[in-house]
């Protein structure tokens, strides 16, 4: 599905054309991905496979983000960080709700948000990621357009690579 969004920001307006899709793949029976593609947030949550509630964890994180924002205006960076914390708290509540210490609900979260520092500021993109899901940008300024990674994995493997 392709959608168009009009956003009033600062001294002007921005029109975004957005498309999103998720697929279970060839190995798993349950799609543990959830996504939000509605201004000001565009993100994917990848439920942790092998853990109970991976699909619920990703859906919970995305729903928490969806409930935080007005889709017609950018948000502030601080509000985005608060929304991520609330999404994390909602996922942690799933684990508590299960009532079993062996049940762990978890998800990665990666995306971008359209943010402004103050109402008259020019909006810009804020990149965020938790876990090993990545954020890329499509670079059309290169001789051959290419995907360029803009996030750094938040994982033990990345810590070992950085050491």
Annotate each language-model stretch with its function.
Residues 1-163:
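PP2C/PPM-type serine/threonine phosphatase catalytic domain
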């Amino acid at each position: 599905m392709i959608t168009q969004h009009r956003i009033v920001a600062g001294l002007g307006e921005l029109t975004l054309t957005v498309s999103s899709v998720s697929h279970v793949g060839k190995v798993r029976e349950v799609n543990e991905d959830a996504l939000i593609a509605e201004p000001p947030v565009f993100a994917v949550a990848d439920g942790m496979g092998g853990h109970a509630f991976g699909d619920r964890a990703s859906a919970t994180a995305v729903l928490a983000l969806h409930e935080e924002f007005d889709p017609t205006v950018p948000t502030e960076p601080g509000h985005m960080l608060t929304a991520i914390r609330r999404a994390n708290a909602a996922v942690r509540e799933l684990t508590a709700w299960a009532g079993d210490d062996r049940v762990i609900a978890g998800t990665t979260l990666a995306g971008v948000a359209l943010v402004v520092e103050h109402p008259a500021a020019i909006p810009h993109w804020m990149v965020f990621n938790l876990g090993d899901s990545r954020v890329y940008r499509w670079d059309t300024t290169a001789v051959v357009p290419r995907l360029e990674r803009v996030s750094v994995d938040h994982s033990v493997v990345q810590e070992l690579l950085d050491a």
